Amino acid sequence: MTGEYKNTLDEKGRIMFPAKIRAELPDSNLVITRGVGNCLWIFTADKWKKFSDEIMKKTSLFKAQSLLVMRRLIAPAQEIEVDKNGRISIPQSLRECAGLEKDCIILGLGKCFELWDLKQYEKYLKESEPDFSEAAEALGEIGF
């Protein structure tokens, strides 16, 4: 599930989940959590289970880096549903974490979706251009 979908957050903190994505979902159950950077990650329930199980297997309560990941990704995760009108409700605490205002963009990354405030995403794109060039070059070096 890939693509970029611009949409608007309504006054109740809901956003329309794109019809193309909804058609590919196994059901209406999703999990939303903080992402890396100023975004939120949205997983299907089954992908979240695999992702979170893998994190839990490879982390320790006695390691600071593990605790950081668990506190930032696992703890804030919340189950949400696509409603009958195709919308998802973004919890207030997560809207604040990602700085979501009105105009947003949903990115399909294959493994999950990212939800960004549109202005923050555009800023990220500009700032990350040099890093993208380096990453693309590194992929070329390993045979892509």
Curated annotation (Swiss-Prot):
Gene Ontology CC terms: cytoplasm; nucleoid
Domain SpoVT-AbrB, chain residue ranges per copy: 4-47, 77-120
Gene Ontology biological process terms, A to Z: negative regulation of DNA-templated transcription initiation
Chain segments annotated as coiled-coil in the UniProt record: none
Cell compartment(s), UniProt: Cytoplasm, Nucleoid
UniProt keyword Phosphoprotein present: no
SUPFAM superfamilies tied to this protein: AbrB/MazE/MraZ-like (SSF89447)
Disulfide pairings: none
The keyword Transcription regulation is annotated on this UniProt entry: yes
InterPro entries the UniProt entry points to: MraZ (IPR003444), MraZ_C (IPR035644), MraZ_dom (IPR020603), MraZ_N (IPR035642), MraZ_sf (IPR038619), SpoVT-AbrB_dom (IPR007159), SpoVT-AbrB_sf (IPR037914)
A single MF term (Gene Ontology): DNA-binding transcription factor activity
Xref: Pfam families: MraZ
UniProt entry keywords in alphabetical sequence: Cytoplasm, DNA-binding, Repeat, Transcription, Transcription regulation
PROSITE patterns membership: SPOVT_ABRB
Family of the protein in this entry: Belongs to the MraZ family.
Subunit composition and interactions: Forms oligomers.
Protein's name according to its UniProt entry: Transcriptional regulator MraZ
